[in-house]
């Protein structure tokens, strides 16, 4: 086989500074290598190889070969964490750099949309579409126990920013028929949130916004496709539909 043209991403150094995670992407967007560079030995070791005949990409992976995926060190630099679509969904994994033992930290018919490791290196702060493909909920994951704790899980979309000390969060929240608003709360389960904005006009509030029902239908590839259904009133219904 002919060698592939590749691009190297910026190094992610461990605390000692003697090793670095290097992500390598093929320019045809079909291969991704996660490697460890040992600066003392000048050695580059393959940790994980991902291949997709169509296109490498997805949440935490990046569909563009010049953009780095979500990566980092774990367990006092004995392991790394990363995301992969090997199951068809983007999930979180850890892998030891010595024995190359891989462990799935998340599994299921949903995707990890965003992952951030906590300061203490024990918990991941995750954005998941766990309840529905269109939702974006916020969760804590203890990667050692694999206990997943919901923090923000109502139907809709949460965009979360964590304070530097990780005690508080600020987030935008919207639903199917309500626009984005800004909130703050403690970064813990069942915390009371404080709404900071009210962006809706009087005309918007006065309008009777329809709340669609949710459904899924099979696509040509036999994969479920999520959709919203807006049903007309019985008086105006003629059996027609618009997709």
Model-flagged regions — what are they?
Residues 55-75, 110-120, 208:
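Short coil-to-beta transitions that initiate beta-strands within beta-rich domains
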Residues 45-46, 55-58, 101-106, 147-152:
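A short beta-strand motif characteristic of beta-propeller blades
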Residues 1-2, 7-12, 17-26, 30-36, ...:
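Non-catalytic accessory segments flanking enzyme active sites
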